[in-house]
């Protein structure tokens, strides 16, 4: 698993995304990033 900070984990081959609310989300991409809306996950370069 991938650690995303305090007590938050994502599965292998996923990426952690820091949301605007200070939470973290798991992206289903190995190189994911937060989208501009800070709520969804996008592939890099999206």
Curated annotation (Swiss-Prot):
GO cellular component terms listed in the entry, alphabetical order: extracellular region
Subcellular location per the Swiss-Prot or TrEMBL entry: Secreted
Disulfide bonds: 4-16, 10-26
Secreted is among the record's keywords: yes
InterPro entries, sorted: Granulin (IPR000118), Granulin_fam (IPR039036), Granulin_sf (IPR037277)
GO biological process: defense response to bacterium
Record keywords: Antibiotic, Antimicrobial, Disulfide bond, Secreted
Family per record: Belongs to the granulin family.
Chain's role: Has antimicrobial activity against Gram-negative and Gram-positive bacteria.
Protein name: Antimicrobial peptide eNAP-1
Annotated organism of origin: Equus caballus
